[in-house]
């Protein structure tokens, strides 16, 4: 398989061309012939014109790459090595929504041939690949795993907006349904990963490793958020405490903040789901999720109290929220907890303007019913810097004072302006 790919006697297909799939596809396209498959025609049109809809990859990345973008299932028949990197979200009840993953699996099953390989990159609970996906591949294709085709799991570690930790320089976990599959999958991924591979002993181990990466981070941030609530009641600045505690060599460098997006705020629920199937009720994971999911409303309430403390009526107060994406310097608005802050203000009768230089106004309107403004349009009683975009880091107190009324509140969620605000009412986590 490896030699056939290198000699371009066959092709590699990447299913799902979003934040995760596209960077992987573009790296492989430097070495082998790639079919980039997606069901979103608007996304495909942009990609064919060398535009990354996610805003992560510059135009020049598309140059000199052996890649074809398509939504044609028939085109997939030209491939023999399939990589599935589609979203694995949760539903309104915080249960895993496997419909994109299982849909992609059925699509690949329709074109699967003897000798083919299927590798999953999507984050799932341990057991999902073997218990949910492989049976569909076998049913649709009429083939048998191990005998007729091979399956592996290699969890994605793409971090949108991060130009330091990339696919190339981040160790990649690989696993396979048997020793032969593991060897071949490892050979193929060596083409695009310079940092080396970690060969997991089983698919289930690789799945579990990925799910706990994000669960661990979620729980640690939840601890910082809870400490922030406690320290706020003491009148102690959380970041001052963390700076002092960080002088010890084994203190872990986490900080409080909003936890949203398609990974950290979602993946723990996949592990919770699997634990419930095993008749175990997760305690720490659930507690962490509760704390982090409540932080948007908590921030909103704190700012409301600050406004009222200045003798102002919150009903009709003007608030500007800066940042709508789930994290800094990305366009992704999925599961953004900034929406909770905004809704809290609206529940109290405040008038809210929202701006974000990275977010798509149309996507924000469709997802949250919020109309973004391009620039501040009035004098505000409070400004909430909810997302620490690089463009916001250059702003100073004089700017914030120029767009606010007297005795205005500046809520600095990530604490990026701490120590530099002296005249406004300042608050941070």
What residues fall within each predicted segment?
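Structural/interface elements that position substrates and couple domains in central-metabolism enzymes
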Residues: 1-429
